[in-house]
Amino acid sequence: MWKCSTVINKNKLIKAEYHTFYTLLFAMAVNAVHLESDAFLVCMNHALSTEKEEVMGLCIGEVDTNRIVHIHSVIILRRSDKRKDRVEISPEQLSAASTEAERLAEMTGRPMRVVGWYHSHPHITVWPSHVDVRTQAMYQMMDQGFVGLIFSCFIEDKNTKTGRVLYTCFQSVQAQKGSEYERIEIPIHVVPHEAIGKVCLESAVELPRILCQEEQDTYRRIHSLTHLDPITKIHNGSVFTKNLCSQMSAISGPLLQWLEDRLEQNKQSIITLQKEKELLTQELAAL
């Protein structure tokens, strides 16, 4: 319960002692986030694509009058720097994401824009680090409704010895004291969809190509060093080939199998719908 220095009519608060009260009540620009299940699927596939480094992407959607962020699709970004505790992208990709949001807005006739970002936390807690909180605060300076999503993966439950994935949504607010920021957890709801949307399907198919480009960029950057001896270059080439094969086995293969299964499922649905159409046509003709 919040402490108040003055109370009127039992309930009306005039002055709160804690700055956090006003922060939560007035400064929070977003009430909740609705993440569509097909966009959630792409985020999960992206987060699980690599166990050693963090990955990052941008969320495309809209904000309604009730201050609820609706995330309809995501854009997978190619990393310019791969580390286990942080991820960096180029400004050109942010500009390209804004252009993609404008294209989706024209295609759907809805006010689509970049409404948030997501990244993974492999093997660590789902809660944002101080770097994440500062990054989120920087984004909110440009857009108060901007949100951050974190997917914590490759976490083992100590009791059941099974893997689990945790996710959260947050924003940043000014801390009670000092110039630092602190996180506010935003309620997030996954909205079920019977089928995957076209934009999310394109993002899912794009994932193997982006991962391959990242490996190629890393290999070319190292291979261009002039001081490497031939044995080292051969070794680096072998590592590059091994990484590509691992991606094909862990990402491209399962994705292809999933797409083939979805295609077969769609064919069966078409057959079922055609039979229903014939029955309805016969019933209509009998009237």
Curated annotation (Swiss-Prot):
One of its GO terms (biological process) is angiogenesis. Its cofactor is Zn(2+). The keyword Lipoprotein does not apply. Residues 256-283 form a coiled coil. Zn(2+) binds at residues 119, 121, 132. Metalloprotease that specifically cleaves 'Lys-63'-linked polyubiquitin chains, leaving the last ubiquitin chain attached to its substrates. Catalytic subunit of the BRISC complex, a multiprotein complex that specifically cleaves 'Lys-63'-linked ubiquitin in various substrates; brcc3 does not have activity by itself, but needs to be associated into a higher-order assembly, for minimal in vitro activity. Monomer. Homodimer. Component of the BRISC complex, at least composed of abraxas2, brcc3, babam1 and babam2. Interacts with abraxas2; the interaction is direct and may form a heterotetramer. Component of the BRCA1-A complex. Both the BRCA1-A complex and the BRISC complex bind polyubiquitin. This is Lys-63-specific deubiquitinase. It comes from Danio rerio.
